[in-house]
Amino acid sequence: MSTEVSPATAWSLAFLTQLVSSGIQHLVLSPGSRSQALALAADALSQTDPTGLQVHVCIDERTAGFYGLGLAIHTGVPTVLLCTSGTAPAHYLPALLEAKHSGVPLIAVTADRPVELRGVGANQTTDQVGLFGVGVHASIDTPAPEANNRLFDGAAARASDLFRLAMSGAKGGRPGPVHLNIAFREPL
């Protein structure tokens, strides 16, 4: 049995570690298969330092969005909303719009299929790139991490950028929501 870590797992751990280092305290998880690397990394981080990241599991994405909004209002720090691919991300939109209008920092992280599996008619595939439109300050689509590529170097930088954008807005304005769509290849 191999103990090698998949690129998805390594990238997810680097990304979430940097978000926690930036000040993230809460992550609201709506689990699914495509987001499992991120979910497992979040769980590992919360187990390593129970005073650091708190992971809240919420099966319904719409409820998760508003729960995360409440946490961000209460703490004044961005809360991460994390879900799988398909129709799941669409349920975040009402909470993201509330966050934008209220100046509340939220970071929506959506797992997605790699680019070669998008738009091919697979079950529940949804075009997640730009899904939230004007409801977020910024929307970023990240290619699937692969072994031995420079994307690992960019995971921490991407996390820092998202935190900054959520706190100050994409154009230096007020806090609000941002979206990161991350493609993952199998093995997840």
Predicted regions and their residues:
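N-terminal alpha/beta PP-like core and its mobile active-site loop of ThDP/TPP-dependent enzymes
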Residues: 2-188
